[in-house]
A protein has these predicted regions:
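Short, well-ordered beta-strand elements
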Residues: 50, 56-61, 84-92, 171-174
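Short beta-strand scaffold segments in enzyme catalytic cores
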Residues: 46-50, 56-58, 137-145, 222-227, ...
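A two-mode feature
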Residues: 2-5, 164-253
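A phosphate-binding glycine/aspartate-rich beta-alpha loop in the early core of alpha/beta enzymes
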Residues: 62, 67-94
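Contiguous domain-boundary segments centered on the initiation and propagation of an alpha-helix
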Residues: 2-43, 83, 89-165, 240-242, ...
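Solvent-exposed alpha-helices and their adjacent loops that cap or buttress functional pockets
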Residues: 38-43, 48-51, 71-72, 79-82, ...
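A short, polar/proline- and glycine-enriched secondary-structure boundary/capping micro-motif
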Residues: 67-73, 98-102, 170-173, 245-250
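Beta-strand scaffold of nucleotide-dependent catalytic cores
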Residues: 57-61, 70, 160-163
Length: 253
């Protein structure tokens, strides 16, 4: 069976917390059945990542949609912590995203229990890309090497683009994915400061997502932003103007 023949993990709606299964394929942000009866997956959303001097900033919009045509949820949290010093942004099908996050967390725990040491970002990204193969999920993985990792460089920030073919690319500055990535990349190109710390990089990430939301119909309804440092992952919500709304809990679990 090829990845294209693989049935959705969410066909019965049991992994659809947004209640959007209504004859079409529920997705973060969208997917639909093709004329041939197969499932086509889109990556309509906006996710961005920025490498800062002391960590990584991840940000996404909050909209879930069906094929970018119908807004099915306006308060989705698309950034998830997967390790004490790492988080993932998610674009793709809800069921597959949930399964991917659970497996990645389990693999990280198993790795550390077997080796008796903390998992480096290099190792986490390798595992993350391997288990993603064939899944309709498009993540950014950002994190900081923890103290006690196998490799040297504790405190070093890393940002990776992962793809469904098992690919893995480390970004040295910033990255954007999803249907709003063109506008977001332009905003990042204009505002990115290579010497900025996490606090300075947060507004840049938020501005990039908001800029994309102005033009991309599959993105919008505010921003989820995560600060990832050696001290952990701190997630917060911003409204459609970028104003702070408090901490974020839950998401694509």
């Amino acid at each position: 069976m090829t990845p294209d023949d693989r049935p959705s993990l969410d066909l019965d709606g049991s992994l659809d917390p947004f209640g959007t299964n209504a004859g079409t394929h529920s997705a973060l942000p969208g997917g639909h059945e093709s004329a041939e009866g197969g499932v086509e997956y889109s990556t309509g959303t906006t996710t961005v990542g920025i490498v800062a001097a002391d960590g990584v900033v991840l940000a996404t919009d909050r909209r879930a949609s069906l094929g970018g045509q119908f807004v099915s949820n306006k308060s989705v949290v698309k950034v998830e912590q997967v390790h004490p010093t790492a988080a993932v942004t998610i674009a793709g099908t809800v069921g597959a995203a949930q399964a991917y996050l659970k497996q990645l967390r389990a693999e990280a725990d198993l790795y550390e229990n077997r080796r008796g040491s903390r998992m480096s970002m290099e190792a986490l990204s390798t595992v993350g890309s391997a288990i993603l193969r064939g899944l309709p999920v498009s993540p950014l993985l950002g994190g900081v090497d923890p103290t006690g990792a196998d490799e040297n460089g504790a405190g070093e920030p890393h940002l990776y683009q992962l793809d469904g073919a098992g690919g893995r690319i480390e970004e040295s500055a910033y990255a954007a994915t999803g249907s709003g990535m063109t506008v977001a990349t332009g905003a990042l190109e204009r505002e990115y400061d290579p010497d900025a710390d996490v606090e300075v990089a947060v507004p840049t990430a938020v501005d990039a997502v908001l800029a994309a939301s102005e033009r991309d119909t599959a993105s919008g309804n505010g921003v989820v932003v995560a600060r990832v440092t050696g001290d952990g992952v701190e997630t917060e919500l911003r409204d459609a103007t970028g104003a702070h709304m408090g901490g974020a809990a839950g998401g694509v679990r």
